[in-house]
Amino acid sequence: MSWQEKINAALDARRAADALRRRYPVAQGAGRWLVADDRQYLNFSSNDYLGLSHHPQIIRAWQQGAEQFGVGSGGSGHVSGYSVAHQALEEELAEWLGYSRALLFISGFAANQAVIAAMMAKEDRIVADRLSHASLLEAASLSPSQLRRFVHNDVTHLARLLASPCPGQQLVVTEGVFSMDGDIAPLAEIQQVTQQHNGWLMVDDAHGTGVIGEQGRGSCWLQKVKPELLVVTFGKGFGVSGAAVLCSSTVADYLLQFARHLIYSTSMPPAQAQALRASLAVIRRDEGDARREKLVSLIARFRAGVQDLPFTLADSCSAIQPLIVGDNSRALQLAEKLRQQGCWVTAIRPPTVPAGTARLRLTLTAAHEMQDIDRLLEVLHGNG
């Protein structure tokens, strides 16, 4: 088989399964409205959960940062790319979340890959929730360590896997709020079992940070859990992009020596760090509380109105509200019908989710209004 035949076969298989991904160029993709092909849609696909992507103070902070620092960092943080703006953001994040140190990364994917690649050796074992994000599972699969997956949120199964003899160290990996189901991991129980087996816990709280918990500190804070490794990202609740790893001082020093994504990647622009500092300030103050409270009300309104639809509504109290449709083609058709009626939604299909669980991944944000939720419900009931 030639290279071209290999590529064609893979694409043909995706098309046959109604699983071929495609991108839509949009004029605006975050916030309450999505604009594409000169048409405006109510946007129920964005991860901009607090509606901060268009916040004037955050935009102004980025603009002022670009004027002060330029539009790029100029290099890796190990050379010339670690600015006073990066340092200030790291210190503010560490203080906010109660850790000694924070290290910035260009994306959550990079952060997860970097930590696992740097921490794990052949004699070690990763025990991961089987529904963990692709970045976590891919990093675990590529690492030299053993990978075992436990049934989603099943602490008993986790304990059984941890009890199996391991010559090295064990790292338990999970999300805080799961990206495709919207449910929250039982972190207190997971941490207890992990500690009983002398393991470390790594939590990717991409979809919880900024959005839930006191001052938006996320799912770990909400459950009074402090994992050894906490990954937070800035493309969701913060409304920007990037990520950070929260950890002890010694682990931070270790990652600075051995995390190749840090050493060999150009760091985020200092102007972006300034925007993230402004976003964090909004998240922590009363305005952040008001946005989170509004989001909770919108979620309650949606869940109350969707109960009698002929779809499975995931057990989620987060901004992620998946409607499980099942069949790939049906999910695609339903998403298209909703778009035709002014609601932009995304059909998520395998391999992103398990086979037979194709869904509409609906996301609600604080930028929405109650009438937006009512319109979504009206359209869903008309196509159920």
Swiss-Prot record:
InterPro entries linked to this entry: Aminotrans_II_pyridoxalP_BS, Aminotransferase_I/II_large, AON_synthase_class-II, AONS_Archaea/Proteobacteria, AONS_Proteobacteria, PyrdxlP-dep_Trfase, PyrdxlP-dep_Trfase_major, PyrdxlP-dep_Trfase_small
Binding site for pyridoxal 5'-phosphate: G108, F109, S179, H207, T233
Keyword Protease: no
Its biological purpose: Catalyzes the decarboxylative condensation of pimeloyl-[acyl-carrier protein] and L-alanine to produce 8-amino-7-oxononanoate (AON), [acyl-carrier protein], and carbon dioxide.
Cofactor: pyridoxal 5'-phosphate
Top EC class of this enzyme: transferase
Lineage summary: Bacteria, Pseudomonadati, Pseudomonadota, Gammaproteobacteria, Enterobacterales
EC number(s) stated in the UniProt entry for this protein: 2.3.1.47
GO terms for biological process, alphabetical: biotin biosynthetic process
NCBIfam families in UniProt: bioF (TIGR00858)
Protein name, per record: 8-amino-7-oxononanoate synthase
Pathway info: Cofactor biosynthesis; biotin biosynthesis
GO molecular function, one term: 8-amino-7-oxononanoate synthase activity
Residues annotated for substrate binding in this entry: R21, H133, T352
Superkingdom in the source lineage: Bacteria
Record's keyword annotation contains Transport: no
Positions carrying N6-(pyridoxal phosphate)lysine: K236
Keywords linked to the UniProt accession: Biotin biosynthesis, Pyridoxal phosphate, Transferase
